[in-house]
Regions:
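Conserved catalytic-core motifs of eukaryotic protein kinase domains, centered on the activation segment
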Residues: 39-41, 64-69, 127-128, 212-213
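Flexible "cap/lid" loop of the alpha/beta hydrolase fold
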Residues: 102-106, 110-140
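Catalytic histidine-centered segment of alpha/beta-hydrolase-like enzymes
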Residues: 230-246
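N-terminal cap/lid segment of alpha/beta-hydrolase-fold proteins
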Residues: 1-13
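Glycine-rich His-Gly loop
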Residues: 29-32, 95, 204
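Conserved HGGG/HGGXW glycine-rich cap/lid loop of the alpha/beta-hydrolase fold
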Residues: 10-66
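Active-site loop/oxyanion-hole signature of alpha/beta-hydrolase fold enzymes
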Residues: 42-45, 54-92, 96, 247
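Conserved serine/cysteine hydrolase catalytic core
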Residues: 166-221, 226-229
Length: 256
């Protein structure tokens, strides 16, 4: 499989793209809420010499829009199952994408040879704060959810400076955003005791305290895990610290 792909199912299409070392170990990059596969490109390029890298737009985002849903983690695991087509893979999940990776590890078992999570939200817990970008997005109407999420994440000034085309694209993804985050707040999409895959639990020391707490919780409750901090990084470490992200949170999976 090479280049851009469109995987179709009864529920809708999923856009994906593969690059890197042909025949190398497969690494799948799973983006977070209101993001897209293009946001994982810098990290992907760090890995092209050592792995085959698959990036994809999760249902309802970017080139996988429009999509009728549902947008739960369980449905997204089925999208991932289709993209893997039986191949073994290492899964790298940024933010919400970490929940997809963990749920896939539980569902697909030995087919998943390693998992990395980075500042993955555990928003079904009572201790998870209700003032996060995700919480604000869920509390908004679908038409306004994406804008509210982005303003909370990057600030009003940066949002207003975005091109109108970009803002329009983000706003139309509000349905996917509300659908996936609402589902996540209702119940855990995986059980730590049922995940045996090695997991690297990442966070940045310039990120929010609750994201660090979430990474520590994962490390404490998964059976085979390590806690990894990227020095100087915030929530978007895959973009701002892509080399460190690859070295600390991806390459260890390829060395075993």
């Amino acid at each position: 499989m090479q280049g851009a792909q469109h995987h179709s199912s009864d529920e809708g299409h999923i856009f994906s793209e593969e690059a890197g070392l042909v025949g190398g170990p497969l690494v799948v990059l799973i983006h977070g809420s209101l993001d897209r596969s293009a946001g994982m490109l810098r990290l992907s390029r760090q890995l092209h010499d050592v792995a085959r890298v698959l990036r994809y737009d999760r249902r309802g985002y970017a080139k996988s829009w429009p999509h009728p849903g549902p947008f739960s983690v369980a449905h997204q695991v089925e999208d991932l199952r289709g993209l893997l087509a039986g191949r073994d893979a290492v899964l790298i999940g940024h933010s919400y994408g970490g929940n997809v990776a963990l749920a896939a590890a539980q569902s697909l078992g030995q087919q998943i040879t390693g998992v990395t999570t980075y500042e993955t939200p555990l928003s079904w817990f009572d201790w998870w704060p209700g003032t996060t970008a995700g919480a604000i997005g869920v509390a908004s109407d679908v038409d306004d959810a994406a804008e509210a999420f982005m303003v909370r994440l990057i600030g009003l000034e940066r949002w207003n400076a975005l091109p109108e085309r970009t803002k329009t694209e983000r706003r139309r993804e509000g349905e996917a955003l509300v659908g996936e985050l609402s589902s996540l707040r209702q119940s855990a999409p995986w059980e730590a005791s049922l995940i045996s895959t090695r997991v690297l639990c990442g966070y940045g020391n310039r990120g929010s305290a609750h994201h660090a707490d979430g990474a520590r919780w994962l490390n404490s409750n998964l059976s085979d895990s390590s806690l990894v901090c990227i020095d100087g990084a915030g929530h978007n470490a895959h973009m701002t610290h892509s080399a460190e992200f690859a070295r600390l949170l991806v390459q260890p999976h390829l060395e075993v």
